[in-house]
Structures are given as C-alpha cells and as structure tokens.
Amino acid sequence: MAYYKGAASEGGRAMQLMKKREIAQQEIEFRKKKIEEDLKVSNIESKFATHYDAVEQQLKTSTIGLVTLDEMKQKQEDIVREREKKLAQKKEEKDREKLKALEAKQAEKDRQRKQIQALSFNPEEDEESFDDEDEEEPLEIKPHKWQTEECTEPRIKKIKKNPDVDTSFLPDREREEMDNKLREELRQEWAMKQATLKDQEIPITFSYWDGSGHRKCVTMKKGNSIYQFLQKCLEMLRKEFSELKTVMADQLMYVKEDLILPHHYTFYDFIVTKARGKSGPLFSFDVKDDIRMISDASVEKEETHAGKVLLRSWYERNKHIFPASRWEPYDPTKVYDKYTIKDKCKK
C-alpha cells in the first residue's frame, strides 16, 4: 500500500480516494462472478429450451385446423417419441464412428508390430518360409560376420552339483525321521532290557541287629526298593522277635557296608552303578569270606558283608558306640577309594 507524502489535509483526501477505489474494485469483482453464474445457468436451460422449441415448432407445422385436447396430447407424445428416436440414432452413429476410429487405430498398431517382427532374425520364421516354397535347390547361406563372432565366444557353463560332496551336515527330513526312528527303537530295546534286569531275582543275606547278629536270607527282585525289602524282613522277623510285632517298616534301617541306605533306593540302582561302601561293595548282596582278612585289600572284590536290619530307636541310643559309630548316611556323590574298618570315634 502506497503512502502519500505531503500536507496532512492532502493526505486525508488521498486516503478517502483509495478507500473508494477499493470499494469500487470489490463491486466489479462481485458483478463479474454473478455474470459468470448466470451464464452457466443459461447454458443449461438453453439445452432443454432447444429441444422444447423444436418439438413445439414441429407440433405447430403438423397441426391444421381445430383438434381436440386428446388428439393434441397424442400428437405431442408421438413427436417427442420420434424426436428421442432420432437423437438416439445420432448418438449410435457417433458411437459407431468412434468404434471404427479405434479399430482403425488398433489395426495400424498391429500392422506396425508385424513390420517390426518381420525385420527380426527369427530362425523359426525362416524355416516356415522355406517349407512354403516349392522344391528348389538348397541355397548355401553364409553367416554374417557378427554371427560368427558370437559363435566363437566361449559359452558360460552352468554350475552343476557334485555328487561326491559330503552333505550329511545339511538338514534332511528323511534322514532325521530315520534317526528318530532308530533312537526310538534303541530306547525301547534298552527299556526292555532294563525291565528284564529289574525282574531278575537275587538272594539277599541280612542280619537283624539288636547288639548281636541274627542272620536270615530273603529273595527279592532287583527292581524292589529298600522299603519293600524291609517290609518282607519284618514279616519274617515278627515270628521270632516280639518287639517287632507293633513296628512298621518306616521304623527300620538297613545298613550295608557301614552306610545307611535310604528307603527309596532300589537294589538295581546299586548294581548298575557298582556303588561302593566304606567296608565293601554295595552291588553284591550275598555273603562270602570277610574281605578284611584278605592280604591284598586294595583290590576290588565282590565279597561283601551281610547287611544289618535294625530299629531306628536302637541306632539313636547306640550311635556313639562301635559299630554304629562308623555308620553314616549314603551319599552317591562321595567316593570311597579304600575300604576301612577303623572306628571313626577313635583317634
């Protein structure tokens, strides 16, 4: 916006003139928009007016004399129907012309494509052209220079697989299924062997200990637990020892090679692991000569002592006296390299 530089009165007058000019400019723009809108409406109305005028003109020219209102309406409908029919025919003709133009354009494209294909060197097309010709003498066709150059270039060989390469490290579904099947068969075979071993019977010699030994023998299966063994011993001992009539198997202890064996272990556990105690092996349950009397006690032998079956209450009263002072709970992680008979309370 420009500012007037001069007297104050002249400046105020200039401002008024500029405002009037802006208002006049806005009125011109408003009138211009209104005229454009009127022109749009008139164009739309003129299309309908042209159709209506043509129908009215034809109705006037075809009507002669006085006619009734029904005849006038019927004639008007006929003229409108005929007019619409003509307009539809004109539209169909225009559509047909457009379709012909499109077909001609497509035909021109096809013709150009065929010309381009005819220029390409296609050996199959050459063979077809030779078959169509009559039997003539074969012509010797010399290859072009660029064709001979391409033929002389070495072709890149495709990479092939070497059948001698070891592929055992690669994943193979069939091999994995075979391995899993073999593992399952071996597992079942091993389980059957273990079940057979656990079902084997062994004689177990034991001694009921109440300060002195009372040797007995029972037959058990390798898969039986120490608790089951104590139950069977208790049934046998109740007939001879009155103090055991009200006792349960939980109140008994089984001491083998100076180790107190827990009730949940089985004889199979000691046999398979070849467990060793403080004074002899735990995997043999029959009784032979005392291994402590053999000169070479450092050599592992299967001779063993009879295990002791006793009341837990007796052990609690006498655990400070030999031989109970040597006894200790069984620990599978502890290794006994040498057998000993020395009392742990004596120095």
From Swiss-Prot:
Compositionally skewed regions (Acidic residues) per UniProt: 123-138
Annotated GO CC locations: nucleus
Amino acid composition bias (Basic and acidic residues), ranges on this chain: 77-113
BP term (GO), one: chromatin organization
Region (Disordered): 77-142
Short name of any one Pfam family annotated for the protein: XAP5
Domain of life: Eukaryota
Family: Belongs to the FAM50 family.
Name by which UniProt lists this protein: Protein FAM50 homolog
Protein's organism: Aedes aegypti
